[in-house]
């Protein structure tokens, strides 16, 4: 596959969605939103209109290579087909409600999805530009150090609301090309939500990201991060091949049970066994997984815990990202000191692990790891909060 740059209430132990179930909100119109369809589905849709498969490919190219949403702009499509598409279909990406820019070049967008918002983050670096994409409105997993989890859970995002984040960001970044803004080269499913609890919408969206007529990214440049929904991870390996990152954050079950509650259902040993099964199937990971480990002061950052982590991971090929914890209002944790992070990192490297201390990006606009909140109406009837404003607002039930 050629690679191009992109310019233009659920319980913790909820089972993965079945093959024929997609959680969505009702579309705003009766027209088909083409952003909900991967290439196979697009071809089926065009076949139903009596059109040949290459017409679907042409439209996809205009949609994703050029970020066009008006059929009249698609000049190699005959007028009759353009008129037919205008009647039965649309290209409708979620709109930006708010944009914030960090001093380090990071951009955070609050994206409107129905009457709520999710957050999408663009992170430029010297050799790449990564887009962090959300998969759910809120999150059901209740990880104690994560701002998103404190908002509760509302619903899964549709395919169009996931790939639409990439489409919208690519269109904005494309408009900034003259300023030297780097095109998107990588996408990470590390925004709001647990991607494996929305598998039937996340997988088609990632498929479009990697499709030559979509955004054309290589499978090594599309990463899914999970906290450990083991049955869905096994299912993922049979559905698609993408890079995998795991949110581990603790070397022992007693600590992980407290800060990542899904561990009470799928413990570390069970989780890592599933990771190894995925690696056996995957070519996207280069034989190893990325382990994410948020550093919490005097919670999981001692030298002894570094040794425990090395022992825990000895049978799992991996590289380790140590992530400075990013605070949010009301959180009971503190960020590990640089000296504790350095000692922790040195222990892991002595065991031979590739260990990287992640540089915090966008923390001045609450766009760093663990800070994404958006606006969530929680179906479990917790208090609705809009963290971007930093103030609680009235409860609204669904």
Swiss-Prot record:
Pfam families reported for this sequence: Radical_SAM, RlmN_N
Q: Which UniProt keywords apply?
A: 4Fe-4S, Cytoplasm, Disulfide bond, Iron, Iron-sulfur, Metal-binding, Methyltransferase, rRNA processing, S-adenosyl-L-methionine, Transferase, tRNA processing
The answer to whether the entry has keyword Iron-sulfur is yes
Q: Which GO terms describe its biological process?
A: rRNA base methylation; tRNA methylation
- Entry cofactors: [4Fe-4S] cluster
Q: Where does S-adenosyl-L-methionine bind?
A: 193-194, 225, 247-249, 326
Cofactor annotation comment: Binds 1 [4Fe-4S] cluster. The cluster is coordinated with 3 cysteines and an exchangeable S-adenosyl-L-methionine.
Residues forming coiled coils = none
From the UniProt record, list the reaction(s) this protein catalyses. Answer: adenosine(2503) in 23S rRNA + 2 reduced [2Fe-2S]-[ferredoxin] + 2 S-adenosyl-L-methionine = 2-methyladenosine(2503) in 23S rRNA + 5'-deoxyadenosine + L-methionine + 2 oxidized [2Fe-2S]-[ferredoxin] + S-adenosyl-L-homocysteine; adenosine(37) in tRNA + 2 reduced [2Fe-2S]-[ferredoxin] + 2 S-adenosyl-L-methionine = 2-methyladenosine(37) in tRNA + 5'-deoxyadenosine + L-methionine + 2 oxidized [2Fe-2S]-[ferredoxin] + S-adenosyl-L-homocysteine
Q: What does this protein do?
A: Specifically methylates position 2 of adenine 2503 in 23S rRNA and position 2 of adenine 37 in tRNAs. m2A2503 modification seems to play a crucial role in the proofreading step occurring at the peptidyl transferase center and thus would serve to optimize ribosomal fidelity.
Q: Which EC class does it fall in? A: transferase
Boundaries of every Radical SAM core domain copy: 125-364
A GO molecular function for this record? tRNA binding
Residues annotated as binding [4Fe-4S] cluster: 139, 143, 146
Question: Its principal location?
Answer: cytoplasm
Q: Which Gene3D superfamilies does the annotation name?
A: 1.10.150.530, Aldolase class I
- What cellular component GO annotations does this protein have? cytoplasm
**Which family does the record assign?**
Belongs to the radical SAM superfamily. RlmN family.
Mind telling me which InterPro entries this protein's record contains?
Answer: Aldolase_TIM (IPR013785), Methyltransferase_A (IPR040072), RlmN_N (IPR048641), RNA_MTrfase_RlmN (IPR027492), rRNA_lsu_MTrfase_RlmN/Cfr (IPR004383), rSAM (IPR007197)
| UniProt organism field | Yersinia pestis
* Name by which UniProt lists this protein: Dual-specificity RNA methyltransferase RlmN
Disulfide bond residue pairs: 132-369
């Amino acid at each position: 596959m050629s690679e191009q740059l992109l310019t233009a209430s659920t319980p913790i132990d909820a089972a993965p969605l079945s093959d024929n179930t997609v959680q969505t909100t009702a579309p705003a119109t009766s027209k088909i939103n083409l952003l909900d369809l991967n290439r196979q589905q697009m071809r089926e849709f065009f076949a139903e209109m009596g059109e040949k498969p290459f017409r679907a490919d042409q439209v996809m190219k205009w949609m994703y290579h050029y970020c066009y949403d008006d059929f009249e702009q698609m000049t190699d499509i005959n007028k009759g087909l353009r008129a037919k598409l205008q009647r039965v279909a649309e290209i409708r990406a979620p709109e930006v409600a708010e944009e914030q820019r960090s001093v380090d070049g990071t951009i955070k967008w609050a994206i409107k999805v129905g009457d709520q918002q999710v957050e999408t983050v663009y992170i430029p670096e010297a050799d790449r530009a990564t887009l962090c994409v959300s998969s759910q409105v809120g999150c059901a997993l209740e990880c104690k150090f994560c701002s998103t989890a404190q908002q509760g859970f509302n619903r899964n995002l549709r395919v169009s609301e996931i790939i639409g984040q990439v489409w919208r960001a690519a269109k904005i970044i494309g408009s900034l090309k003259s300023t030297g803004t780097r095109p998107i080269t990588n996408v990470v499913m590390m925004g709001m939500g647990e991607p494996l609890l929305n598998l039937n919408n996340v997988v088609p969206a990632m498929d479009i990201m990697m499709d030559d007529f979509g955004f054309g990214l290589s499978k090594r440049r599309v990463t899914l991060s999970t906290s450990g929904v083991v049955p869905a991870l096994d299912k993922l390996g049979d559905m698609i091949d993408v890079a995998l990152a795991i949110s581990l954050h603790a070397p022992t079950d007693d600590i992980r049970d407290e800060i990542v509650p899904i561990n009470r259902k799928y413990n570390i040993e069970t989780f890592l066994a599933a990771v190894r099964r995925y690696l056996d199937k995957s070519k996207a990971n280069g034989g190893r997984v990325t382990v994410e480990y948020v550093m919490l002061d005097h919670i999981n950052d001692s030298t002894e815990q570094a040794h425990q982590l090395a022992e825990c991971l000895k049978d799992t090929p991996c590289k380790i990202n140590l992530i400075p914890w990013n605070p949010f209002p009301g959180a009971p944790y503190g960020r590990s000191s640089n000296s504790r992070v350095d000692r922790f990192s040195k222990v892991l490297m002595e065991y031979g692990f590739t260990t990287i201390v992640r540089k915090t990006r966008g923390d001045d606009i609450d766009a760093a790891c663990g800070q994404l909140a958006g606006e969530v109406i929680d179906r479990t009837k917790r208090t609705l909060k809009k963290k971007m404003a930093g103030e609680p607002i009235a409860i609204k039930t669904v």
